[in-house]
């Protein structure tokens, strides 16, 4: 696996879950002897929704909600075979979306 790189992108609504998952990935990769760059925090996407409270009139009565999507990026620069096996066996939290690309 010489001259290869594994790029891992993580997305989650809860920043504690994503930080815990990135810490597990970094610790697993370092334990198997790979070189790690990151975790790099990417911009947080904020979606805001405004909803009318009243069913009929009172346009001034509104509630505002927000969903934040936190993102992190981890690069594993020199992965070994043990690194790939350990990452495949890693069990992460259910609220974290993981995208892995080889480059």
Curated annotation (Swiss-Prot):
Q: Which Gene3D superfamilies match?
A: Ribosomal protein S10 domain (3.30.70.600)
Q: Which GO terms describe its cellular component?
A: ribonucleoprotein complex; ribosome
The protein's UniProt keywords, in alphabetical order, are: Ribonucleoprotein, Ribosomal protein
Name the GO terms of the biological process aspect: translation
Q: Which GO terms describe its molecular function?
A: structural constituent of ribosome; tRNA binding
Record-stated family? Belongs to the universal ribosomal protein uS10 family.
Alphabetical list of HAMAP family matching this protein:
Ribosomal_uS10
Instruction: Return the NCBIfam families for the record.
Output: PRK00596.1, rpsJ_bact
State the function annotated in the UniProt record: Involved in the binding of tRNA to the ribosomes.
Q: How does it assemble?
A: Part of the 30S ribosomal subunit.
Query: Per its record, how is this protein called by name?
Result: Small ribosomal subunit protein uS10
- Organism (species): Pectobacterium atrosepticum (strain SCRI 1043 / ATCC BAA-672) (Erwinia carotovora subsp. atroseptica)
């Amino acid at each position: 696996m010489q001259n290869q790189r594994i790029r891992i992108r993580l997305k989650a609504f809860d920043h504690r879950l994503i930080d815990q998952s990135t810490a597990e990935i970094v610790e697993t990769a370092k334990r198997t002897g790979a070189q790690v760059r990151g975790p790099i925090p990417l911009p947080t996407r904020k979606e805001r929704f405004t909803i009318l409270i009243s069913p009929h009139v009172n346009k001034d009565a509104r509630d505002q909600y927000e969903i934040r999507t936190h993102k992190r990026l981890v690069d594993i620069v020199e992965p070994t075979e043990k690194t790939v096996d350990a990452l495949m066996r890693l069990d992460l939290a259910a609220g974290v979306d993981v995208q892995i690309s080889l480059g």
